From Swiss-Prot:
The gene is tmem104. The chain crosses the membrane at residues 16-36, 39-59, 158-178, 197-217, 234-254, 257-277, 303-323, 363-383, 402-422, 428-448, 476-496. It is a multi-pass membrane protein. This is Transmembrane protein 104 homolog. The lineage of its organism: Eukaryota, Amoebozoa, Evosea, Eumycetozoa, Dictyostelia. Coiled coil: none annotated. The keyword Glycoprotein applies.
Length: 499
């Protein structure tokens, strides 16, 4: 069901800005330099900017849909109140014995009641403060519930199938990556091999994320800020170390850097979509904001900052290691760190595994641990909220607290079980990011925006004062056309990779 923050707490737009940035910037950012090294500097920047802009467009559509969903919920509540009042205020028609005064008084009450009912039910003008209040985002309506309100049962079921595949796939990837990273950094212990240590770290990871998944977004505020600091330090370190390498005269010249390799477009496609994904959690982190003016601006600034961070990292990586032919950065001895430049790796942190300072190399190697652990909690909360809405079996008989615990543990621990069974998640990454991610990021927001505005006009005869500037046929068709092209590219990439 729709609902606001369960404990009534809110936070500022600055805090929301941190949440959004943390959720967008994940391990996908570390895979971007590798995609740039294949696609080229210009093509990479253009494609990254295009995907970021399209992601912003579809994010505004979900905000728009969220405001319309709140408007509909408010109006349905008012209609129920009016129905109850009609039953309570019903008066028996006057008889011949009633006095004229009583009859006039009764008629006046009935007329007054009818006028009040019309005022409540009648849509107000497009620019009134009443409209703005009705469209205010006060209730958390998850994307899945919006699909049910605007797309009907078929759209609702399709969306939830796509969403659950995406979220469970995402969490399974994270659950396997974090303990793998820890095992690679620390190595085995005596008789315990790296493989055995992996399961120990997986158990610790489950113990960490399980309790946090019981909370809501606002309860993870300090964890989010700590992660933001850690992430920024790691980003700055990689950028600074790359610039130092360039300044020492070891970097690549502009002639050695790939510029525009259109045949490698598929190499950057999947990771670019993955790097801007935040749409599934928009209701969760926007609803608790205390002042919700200029939400489009808030999202836009976040996407711009993310693009600047991504672009800077990718450009310096190309000019630092774009001309290096050494395939790996591994050292002959694990006890002595001698910086060995290598080709841009699948994750950019691996370019610094042999850095002279062991502290720096280990810190960067642990970067996915900091990022993914926090993102895991946020996505787990999102999955729990959607499962609570999807599965309503015995909802009236089981307390909300028990349901919350059950679905929180389900959303956080099942992916851990998947990571326990397998550590090979490469195919899962491609399917999750390319197919399910495409549906959540592009297709569903377009459908929600189109049909929510259609319902608003046809049933309520009113336009949304918080309407997205991109809600028109041109952008709807553009997004759907791009989705088809992206689907073809993704399928081709998977076929040539796993044939």
């Amino acid at each position: 069901m729709a609902g606001g923050p369960s404990d009534g707490s809110t936070y500022s737009k600055k805090t929301a800005f941190v949440y959004i940035f943390n959720l967008i910037v994940g391990v996908g950012a570390l895979a971007l330099p590798y995609g740039f090294s294949k696609a080229g500097l210009v093509l990479g920047l253009l494609f990254l900017a295009a995907i970021g802009f399209l992601a912003f467009i579809t994010a505004t559509w979900l905000i728009e849909g969220l405001s319309i969903a709140n408007f509909i919920l408010v109006n349905k509540k008012e209609e129920r109140i009016i129905g109850d009042d009609d039953n309570e205020n019903y008066q028996k028609p006057p008889t011949e014995n009633d006095s004229l005064i009583n009859s006039e008084y009764s008629d006046n009450k009935i007329l007054q009641s009818n006028a009040e009912d019309r005022n409540l039910l009648e849509p107000s003008g497009g620019s009134s403060s009443s409209d703005n209040e009705q469209f205010e985002i006060k209730k958390r309506v998850e994307v899945g519930e919006m699909s049910k309100m605007f797309l009907g049962n078929i759209g609702y079921k399709v969306f939830y199938g796509v969403l659950i595949i995406y979220l469970f796939g995402d969490l399974s990837i994270y659950a396997a990556t974090v303990p793998t990273t820890l095992a690679n950094v620390t190595g085995g212990w005596g008789k315990f091999t790296d493989h055995t240590v992996y399961y120990f770290y997986l158990f610790l990871f489950a113990c960490f994320v399980g309790p946090f998944s019981l909370f809501n977004f606002q309860k993870t505020k300090y964890l989010q800020f700590a992660t933001l600091i850690t992430r920024n330090v790691a980003f700055l370190l990689m950028i600074i170390l790359s610039i130092i390498f360039i300044a020492q005269g070891n970097g690549a010249s502009i002639k050695q850097v790939p510029i525009f390799e259109i045949s490698e477009l598929a190499s950057i496609f999947g990771v670019s979509i993955y790097s801007f994904m935040t749409h599934h959690s928009i209701p969760g982190f926007l609803t608790p904001i205390s002042k919700k003016d200029r939400l489009f601006t808030l999202m836009g600034l976040d996407f711009i900052l993310v693009f600047i961070a991504y672009g800077t990292l990718c450009v310096v990586s190309l000019f630092a290691f774009g001309a290096v032919t050494n395939p790996t950065c591994a050292t002959a001895s694990t006890s002595i760190h001698t910086f060995i430049p290598c080709q841009i790796q699948s994750l950019y942190i691996y370019n610094f595994t042999s850095y002279n300072s062991k502290f720096v190399s280990d810190f960067l190697s642990l970067f996915p641990v900091f990022t993914l652990s926090t993102n895991y909690i946020l996505i787990s909360i999102t999955l729990r909220n959607n499962l609570l809405q999807l599965i309503t079996w015995k909802q009236d008989k089981i307390s909300s607290k028990v349901r919350n615990v059950v679905f929180s543990l389900t959303s956080s621990l099942i992916p851990v079980g998947v990571a326990f069974c397998t550590r090979n998640v490469s195919l899962l990454v491609n399917i999750t990011g390319s197919y399910a991610g495409l549906g959540i990021m592009f297709v569903m927001p377009a459908l929600i925006s189109f049909y929510s505005n259609k319902i608003l006009i046809e049933q309520y005869h009113i336009s949304n004062p918080k309407k997205s500037p991109f809600s028109n046929k041109f952008f709807y068709l553009l997004i759907l056309l791009i989705s088809v092209i992206c689907l073809i590219l993704a399928t081709w990439k998977i076929i040539i990779t796993y044939k």
